[in-house]
């Protein structure tokens, strides 16, 4: 009976050690998220600009996505498209287009706070996120 218990305990310890070794063996991806083109400080009503973000990785990612984010959704500056997404790759150029919809004069500071949030997902559940913020004035 004690041999059986001892062998079960030994097997559990071995499983725990092997899990640690296998986890430590997987190198972390080196991910670079770079803003290539942002929004101007001032836009006129009706103007559109595209934010471009480059993603580069030394390992293949499962997906990369860029999404617009607003403090005042639907006012001042709005997204023309809902974002951009690419599948499995090691690099990507993500684009989000914005349009100046209305004046920001009545908003706090006279600007519309707008952001682009980029996420890169890897196998195993690792996610790398970067946020690029802009304050755009629309006279």
Task: Please annotate each region the language model reported.
Residues 47-51:
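Structural beta-strand segments of beta-rich domains
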Residues 31, 70-83:
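Short beta-strand and strand-turn-strand segments in soluble, beta-rich domains
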Residues 37-43, 83-84:
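Short beta-strand segments of immunoglobulin-like
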Residues 125-139:
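Short beta-strand elements
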Residues 88-99:
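Aromatic sugar-binding surface patches on proteins
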Residues 102-113:
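Short glycine/proline/serine/threonine-rich loop/turn segments at secondary-structure transition edges
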Residues 58-74:
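Short acidic, flexible loop segments centered on an aromatic residue
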Residues 19-33:
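Proline/serine/threonine-rich low-complexity linkers at boundaries of modular beta-sandwich domains
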């Amino acid at each position: 009976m004690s041999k059986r218990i001892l062998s079960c305990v030994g097997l559990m310890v071995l499983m725990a050690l092997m899990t640690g070794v296998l986890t430590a063996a997987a190198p972390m991806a080196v991910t670079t998220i770079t803003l290539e083109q942002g929004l101007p400080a001032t836009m006129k009503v009706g103007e559109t600009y595209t934010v471009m973000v480059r993603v580069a990785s030394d390992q293949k990612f499962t997906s990369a996505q860029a999404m617009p984010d607003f403090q005042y959704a639907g006012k001042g500056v709005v997204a023309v498209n809902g974002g951009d997404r690419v599948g499995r790759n090691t690099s990507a150029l993500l684009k989000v287009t914005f349009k100046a919809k209305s004046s920001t004069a009545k908003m706090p500071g006279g600007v519309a706070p707008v952001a682009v949030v980029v996420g890169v997902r890897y196998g195993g559940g690792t996610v790398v996120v970067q946020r690029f913020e802009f304050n755009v004035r629309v006279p």
